[in-house]
Amino acid sequence: MASEIIVDHQQKAFELLKLDAEKILKLIRVQMDNLTMPQCPLYEEVLDTQMFGLSREIDFAVRLGLVDENDGKELLDRLERELSALHDAFTGK
């Protein structure tokens, strides 16, 4: 029973982190589509702030034992790759 609760908390924690990563991606898509260019300091500031916040969330979940460190790194890496591809598509690279 206790191990089922732990697994459930781990799954919920990772799902919440994935949702936060998706929110960052959506925010950047909206910003690129409607508001600013990727070279804009505001764009860079928003992206840096959001990515830093997510990395701190992941670190906290890892320290609590809710998320495996490698899974957390993979989540950040995947988001960075998606953001890079989005940036390249927007700038025509």
From Swiss-Prot:
Domain of life: Bacteria
Pfam families given in the database record: DUF1507
InterPro entries: UPF0358 (IPR009983), UPF0358_sf (IPR036270)
HAMAP family: UPF0358
Family: Belongs to the UPF0358 family.
Protein name: UPF0358 protein RBAM_014700
Species the sequence originates in: Bacillus velezensis (strain DSM 23117 / BGSC 10A6 / LMG 26770 / FZB42)
